[in-house]
Design a protein with these regions (language model features):
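Glycine-rich ATP-lid/hinge loop adjacent to the conserved G-boxes
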Residues: 63, 104-114
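Short conserved segment of the HATPase_c
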Residues: 91-103
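Acidic ATP/Mg2+-coordinating residue in the GHKL
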Residues: 86
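Short helix-loop "hinge" at the ATP-lid/N-box region of the Bergerat-fold HATPase_c
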Residues: 57-61
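Conserved micro-motifs of the catalytic ATP-binding
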Residues: 1, 34, 38-42
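Short beta-strand/loop element within the Bergerat-fold HATPase_c
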Residues: 66-78
Length: 158
């Protein structure tokens, strides 16, 4: 891992460009409202994690309504929280405690052909290695919100 000050907005722009075709093809609105916060992380792995989360938002969108993915940041004291919210099909309450388990696909994953159950597992492991906190909140049939919290850490400042 290469931990250094990283611009969240530049990583989001890169991820948006990578997913541009899928977002357009599936008529998904991407609403980005982020302050240009710098966080201590590995930019390559942050991009990988955001890509996984956005791919899940695209994969599990609600076909019955206009899909929207909202990305925001909030800085409170010594931490920055990056939130990725979608109005997709959500995650069943019974599946939520297991979504970070290796190979766990849940009820939604069993309905989608390209689900391996590895995406959130890897994202969780990367957050642990990088010292970030990962939270997922969801209401089945309504939304999913994934939050990555970055802490200011003097350990990485040489």
């Amino acid at each position: 891992y290469i931990i250094k000050e990283t611009s969240i907005s530049s990583v989001i722009k890169s991820v948006a460009l990578k997913n541009k075709d899928d977002l357009i093809e599936n008529d998904i609105e991407l609403d980005v409202k982020v302050n240009d916060e710098n966080v201590l992380t590995d930019s390559k792995w942050l991009e990988f994690m955001l890509n996984q989360i956005i791919n899940n938002s695209i994969k599990y969108r609600n076909q019955d309504k206009k899909a929207c993915i909202k990305i925001t940041t909030e800085k409170i004291d010594e931490k920055v929280t990056l939130s990725i919210y979608d109005n997709g099909i959500g995650i069943k309450k019974s599946d939520l405690p297991q979504i970070f388990n290796k190979s766990y696909t849940g009820d939604n994953g069993r309905k989608v052909a390209k689900s391996t159950g590895m995406g959130l597992y890897i994202v969780k492991k990367l957050c642990e290695k990088l010292g970030h906190k990962l939270d997922v909140e969801s209401e089945y049939g309504k939304f999913t919100k994934v939050q990555i919290t970055f802490y200011e850490n003097d350990f990485y400042k040489f």
